């Protein structure tokens, strides 16, 4: 039911920050220890032998990159995000562990029991495959493809993953006050459609390994080798057919490509082989006459597949998606095989995360605002919110000044842009009103039952929005999250408490470092309101053109410059028969535009702040001017190491560029950087011709 929406737009890849790891490892003797968070500005992280005008990322981060290899349980390790995430997760673990042992409130008992059930590996092992047997029993009884929709609703009603497609309720992108039914493509287990349809040596190898993985999983579940091979082949055939008709991530970034309003009658006519009436009437959603079919071609193809694929193939497909979807919560044999392929093979991760880490993350995902209430009380001081309010106001002023000064934009469009900026809502720290999880029944000895209860709660919470006014105070992240996001349909920016601390935000450092850290994050999120996606939504959050045709043309010319520039950046090198992996400038365009704009407007805000204090951008601290400290502080946010496998996957699925290019790509488009470091025009970080949107 998790919709394949590319909004809200996150500072990092949504949901998992950097490490995309399984949910819980079955065996773990490690003891939690509090991680050391880095300073906001660290001279020891720098490689002073590097030329900042040639490779600023190496100059600002080189020593850190050299001295901080990727931990065995991670696929990407970042100086700021990863270490702060680990610190927040340690604090979260302290809260959960205490609640599991001695809960003081009903809320603590609920999330304490959820965490305890996850940590109870003995019970998980004892149950083995039993928790998914009821779902498999329903699948085995499926008489024909005509009854598929009824079966899907049964599986969803008990919280079991089933693949196929994604259905739920979200804002109407052309009337953001309304919430409508939406249906999206889905059904794939591999990270992206390219894994199924691109005929490169690398993808052919991955497909072969994926088939072997499925065979092993089916064998563990009781199939003979022959049965497992037949089932694995059937799943591969169906998923490949779905991949061939799936819309690309790049195309789905543009809202007009995913907005197709159908009457329910017309949708049923388009897909007559699928009994939507049964599905919609048995999953517990209210009445609706129209819906947004985000990917019509996918559903036309699915209709044909339902008619042509044998019923046994559909049974194998559904058995697989239940098994794959729950493998991380099953006994050790299933967990290990799942990790071996999706963690080790696909991403280069050497070992699973510690059990306590994964159970902390799982509990936060399932009961985030329950856990978050107590987390905020312990870890988010009121003065942090007050300081953020001031920083946000400073950045809003700078973006307004930037809009006024743009030479390529007409006065008519500037007025509309300023109006949209004035309407942005800021959410800082945590929700004003917490969710009520009292209907989620948690059992201390039933991990999968708890995940099912959470899934049903989230689905029903979403379905209840149908036809109701939008709740503008709702959050899309939990308080401990180290991330931030902008929502075009809400026209709001959201900064969870988790990111509002060192090294991003530090009361004790000079303004240059804070503006280079959290200031650029704020500017980044604001700029999303005016990137190639956000600029298509007005101040109310409606999908509506507010630029003149001439200004839209000028805007597109500038964003095309950025896309072409980032197309040339390397994500992973060539070796053997594996080709070089370049970034996708169109996929990453929104994030790159926001990085560039955020760097510029945060610098403008710093200049205003220093001037108001009677200080100069050229004053030195520890041998560096405030301008230089600003850029170094910004760069050190993005110091990172990443496995090659993860880097290649990210280049296909992640709209964010790697840290190196978030730094070098941004500074080379900002003349103030070249001047701050005395670069000569024509050097790599101070080119004669550069790209600028905002």
Model segments located where?
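Bacterial N-terminal signal peptides that target proteins for export
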Residues: 1-7
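Boundary at the C-terminal end of the N-terminal hydrophobic targeting segment
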Residues: 17-19, 23-27
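Intrinsically disordered, low-complexity linker/terminal regions across diverse proteins
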Residues: 32-34, 235, 265, 269-274, ...
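Short, Gly/Pro- and small/polar-rich lid/capping loops
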Residues: 28-44
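Bacterial N-terminal signal peptides
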Residues: 7-16
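Active-site-surrounding "flap" and adjacent substrate/cofactor-binding loops of secreted or lumenal enzymes
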Residues: 32-35, 50-126
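Noncatalytic, helix-rich "gating/capping" subdomain that lines the substrate-entry/channel surface
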Residues: 97-394
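Hydrophobic/aromatic-rich, well-ordered segments within soluble, folded domains that form packed cores
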Residues: 46-66, 196, 200-219, 589, ...
């Amino acid at each position: 039911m998790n919709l394949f929406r590319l909004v809200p737009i996150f500072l990092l890849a949504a949901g998992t920050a950097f490490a995309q790891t399984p949910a819980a490892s079955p065996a773990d003797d490690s003891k939690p220890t509090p991680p050391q968070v880095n300073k906001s500005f660290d001279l020891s992280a720098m490689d002073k032998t590097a030329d900042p005008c040639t490779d600023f990322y190496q100059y600002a981060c080189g020593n850190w990159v050299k001295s901080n290899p990727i931990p065995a349980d991670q696929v990407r390790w970042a100086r700021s995000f990863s270490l702060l995430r680990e610190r927040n997760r340690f604090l979260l673990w302290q809260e959960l562990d205490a609640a599991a042992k001695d809960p003081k409130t009903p809320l603590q008992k609920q999330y304490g029991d959820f965490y305890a059930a996850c940590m109870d590996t003995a019970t998980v092992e004892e149950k083995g495959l039993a928790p998914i047997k009821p779902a498999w029993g329903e699948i085995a009884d499926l008489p024909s493809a005509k009854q598929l929709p009824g079966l899907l609703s049964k599986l969803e009603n008990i919280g079991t993953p089933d693949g196929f497609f994604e259905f739920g309720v979200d804002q109407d992108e052309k009337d953001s006050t309304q919430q409508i039914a939406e249906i999206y493509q889905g059904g794939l287990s591999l990270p992206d459609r390219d894994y199924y349809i691109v005929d490169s040596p690398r993808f052919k190898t991955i497909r072969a390994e994926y088939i072997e993985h499925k065979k092993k999983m089916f064998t563990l579940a009781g199939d003979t080798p022959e049965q497992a091979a037949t089932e694995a082949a059937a799943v591969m055939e169906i998923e490949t057919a779905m991949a061939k008709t799936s819309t690309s991530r790049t195309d789905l970034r543009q809202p007009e490509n995913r907005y197709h309003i159908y009457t329910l009658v017309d949708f049923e006519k388009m897909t007559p082989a699928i009994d939507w009436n049964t599905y919609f009437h048995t999953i517990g959603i209210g009445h609706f006459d129209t819906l947004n079919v985000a990917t019509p071609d996918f559903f036309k193809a699915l209709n044909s597949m339902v008619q042509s694929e044998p019923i046994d193939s559909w049974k194998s497909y559904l058995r697989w998606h239940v098994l794959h979807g729950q493998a991380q919560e099953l006994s050790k044999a299933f967990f290990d095989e799942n990790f071996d392929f999706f963690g080790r093979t696909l991403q280069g991760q050497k070992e699973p995360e510690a059990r306590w880490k994964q159970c902390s993350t799982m509990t936060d995902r399932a009961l985030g605002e329950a856990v978050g209430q107590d987390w905020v009380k312990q870890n988010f001081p009121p003065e942090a919110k007050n300081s953020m309010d001031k920083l946000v106001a400073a950045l809003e002023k700078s973006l307004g000044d930037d809009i006024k000064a743009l030479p390529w934009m007409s006065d008519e469009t500037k007025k509309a842009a300023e109006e949209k900026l004035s309407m942005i809502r800021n959410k800082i720290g945590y929700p004003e009103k917490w969710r009520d999880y009292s209907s989620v029944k948690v059992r201390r000895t039933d991990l999968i039952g708890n995940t099912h209860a959470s899934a049903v709660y989230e689905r029903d919470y979403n379905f209840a929005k149908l036809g109701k006014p939008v709740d503008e105070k709702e959050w899309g992240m939990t308080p401990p999250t180290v991330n931030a996001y902008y929502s075009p349909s809400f026209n709001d920016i959201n900064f969870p408490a988790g990111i509002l601390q060192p090294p991003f935000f530090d009361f004790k450092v000079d303004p240059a470092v804070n503006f280079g850290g959290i200031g650029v994050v704020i500017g980044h999120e604001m700029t999303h309101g005016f990137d190639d996606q956000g600029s298509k939504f007005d101040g109310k959050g409606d999908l509506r053109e507010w630029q003149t045709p001439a200004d839209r043309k000028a805007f597109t010319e500038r964003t095309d410059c950025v896309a072409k520039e980032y197309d040339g950046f390397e994500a992973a090198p060539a070796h053997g028969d594996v080709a070089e992996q370049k970034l996708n400038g169109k996929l990453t365009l929104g994030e790159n535009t926001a990085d560039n704009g955020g760097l510029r407007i945060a610098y403008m805000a710093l200049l205003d702040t220093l001037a108001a204090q009677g200080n100069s951008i050229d004053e030195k601290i520890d041998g560096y001017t405030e301008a230089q400290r600003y850029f170094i502080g910004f760069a050190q946010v993005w110091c990172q190491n990443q496995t090659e496998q993860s880097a290649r996957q990210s280049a296909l699925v992640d709209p964010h560029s790697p840290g190196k290019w978030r730094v070098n790509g941004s500074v080379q488009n900002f003349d103030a950087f070249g001047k701050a470091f005395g670069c000569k025009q024509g050097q790599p970080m101070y080119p004669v011709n550069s790209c600028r949107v905002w």
